[in-house]
Amino acid sequence: GAADIDGRKMSIWDYWYKEEPERFFDNVGPQDTSTFYANYKEDIKLLKETGHNSFRTSIQWSRLIPDGVGEVNQKAVDFYNNVIDELIVNDVLPIMNLFHFDMPMCMQEKGGWESREVVDAYAAFAKKCFELFGDRVKHWMTFNEPIVPVEGGYLYNFHYPKVKDGKRAAQVAFHTMLANAKSIKEYKELGQD
């Protein structure tokens, strides 16, 4: 949800939905998938009421750094700070994921995970997340199911960019592992172990 507000730019999912909405279940696209952005306080309250002691969510690269590199979106920083603080106030442990299949479209246009430039941009994004939120977030995941973009996007045509090419899939797998390693290195260099 909240796909086109507060400075967030297009991810591959926004682009793909715009191009082929029929590929999405019941034609439901990024704009309508979640109300968490607007209702996070109520959602976190429900987490607490139902006995949850932790919550894993993701920081959207296309929201935090809309152009993939460079300027940080302050509205995104405020949103993620508010979510983290609300979780902590409610004794719910924040667990942050850095990539849940949502490549910024501007990074996909540079080759996505096929591009070493995108690997380096991801490491910089991860470092910025650690710097901004690492004072309160102690549990990080670099990638959600890292094999899915490889298989879905480059072998079996169920994720964007819908390619079927084993060589390119291998490159994407390698660069995903490299991006993981580089982001862990950034984390360790910040002394946040």
Predicted regions and their residues:
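Active-site region of glycoside hydrolase catalytic domains
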Residues: 1-24, 67-68, 78-193
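Aromatic- and Gly/Pro-rich amphipathic surface segment
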Residues: 10-45
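Homeobox/homeodomain signature
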Residues: 27-30, 51, 89-91
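Short, solvent-exposed segments of well-ordered alpha helices
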Residues: 31, 38, 71-74, 167, ...
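Short, acidic/polar
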Residues: 33-47, 118-129
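Catalytic domains of carbohydrate-active enzymes, especially glycoside hydrolases
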Residues: 39-60, 93
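Glycine-rich, proline-tolerant flexible connector loops at the mouths of alpha/beta enzymes
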Residues: 59-72
